[in-house]
Amino acid sequence: MFMFEKPYGMRDSLPGLYETKKKVRHSLTEVMNGWGYRLMETPTLEFYDTVGVQSAITDTQLFKLLDQNGQTLVLRPDMTGPIARVAASKLHEQAYPLRVGYAANVFRAQEREGGRPSEFEQVGIELIGDGSISADAEVIALVVFALKNAGLNSFKIAIGHVALAETLFVDVLGNTERANVLRRFLYEKNYVGYRQHVKQLPLSSIDKTRLLQLLELRGGREVTERAEEIVVSQEGKEVLAQLKSLWETLEDYGCTEYIRLDLSMVSHMSYYTGILFEVFADHVGSVIGSGGRYDQLLAHFNAPAPATGFGLRLDRLLEALDVKEINEPQEAVIFSKEQRLEAFAFAEKERSKGKKIVLQDLAGIENIDAMTKAFEQVTYFIGARKGEQNG
């Protein structure tokens, strides 16, 4: 029946799942706090003309509504835009760099056939005001330490750079319009289509080889050395130098076993300007997190500053962890009016020991057998008798 249905893409979190999410969320934010990132909240609703327009999420995926003054609002589609707004308006007088974190639900309209959630929780951080490679490395290393603290050990972080493929495409093809065709193949990870398209282009065999070799630039630090064979522009060489420096810093963090370079990586997030990365875990078909540098976003809020950060999908992380829902044992105290005072005192004493105690008046139970089966232990305070335990 309609009364039991939810809007498309929305999900319930029943008690067991809720407790599991709470535990995993804490394991992530614990590391974030330990690295000096202070958690904050922003409104669920934002103005479309500010956060909505600046979001990298496509307009068709935004949930829009009108307020009583006729202004268009959006349910926040991500957290980077809202935090950029706050940094520009409320935190701009604080000394940079700023380190802030969040754990919040975001909203994106989905096609009915896609089967994806329209509401999901992101846990992440933003490092604002530091444009160095060291800041990029800190953010990526924090992902590694946070995921390990959550209990995930089988994962990889693929790292790329926005400008590498772009400079190669423009250098070979001559303009961004032609480059956009190849970029779309990479974004969709349609490598077969990419190869077929390159082979049909009216280019020299040398230039075709350069474009095709881009797909092979995946692996460890040696990838940057192989890339020098196809990257000839000064901007491209500077990108490779950044990636080498990033790798060296991540080596010092002790993180490189979880890292691989993928120089063919592109992103649908239009605000990324430099290093970008995606997090993959075994047995999960989609990325469980992503991040990167977005040095131009805060300028749209009249507070230009470099920034980098990441967001992890809590639902996909739970899938990767493959953890059972938490159903902690509970005990019940069933009482009648005659021993209510004793029952209350007993329950408080047990709660002080860290136990979860449900107090239930006998008068409010319709089926005592069904009710008591849900509990690990039941203690009775009924009639004139003292407590009688039935475990």
Curated annotation (Swiss-Prot):
GO terms for cellular component: cytoplasm. Signal peptide: none annotated. Pathway: Amino-acid biosynthesis; L-histidine biosynthesis; L-histidine from 5-phospho-alpha-D-ribose 1-diphosphate: step 1/9. Disulfide bonds: none annotated. It is found in: Cytoplasm. Gene3D superfamilies: 3.40.50.12590, Bira Bifunctional Protein, Domain 2. Its main location: cytoplasm. GO terms for biological process: histidyl-tRNA aminoacylation; L-histidine biosynthetic process. Keywords: Amino-acid biosynthesis, Cytoplasm, Histidine biosynthesis. The keyword Amino-acid biosynthesis applies. It comes from the Bacteria. This function is generally fulfilled by the C-terminal part of HisG, which is missing in some bacteria such as this one. PANTHER family: HISTIDINE--TRNA LIGASE, MITOCHONDRIAL-RELATED (PTHR43707:SF1), HISTIDYL-TRNA SYNTHETASE (PTHR43707). HAMAP family: HisZ. Heteromultimer composed of HisG and HisZ subunits. Belongs to the class-II aminoacyl-tRNA synthetase family. HisZ subfamily. This is ATP phosphoribosyltransferase regulatory subunit.
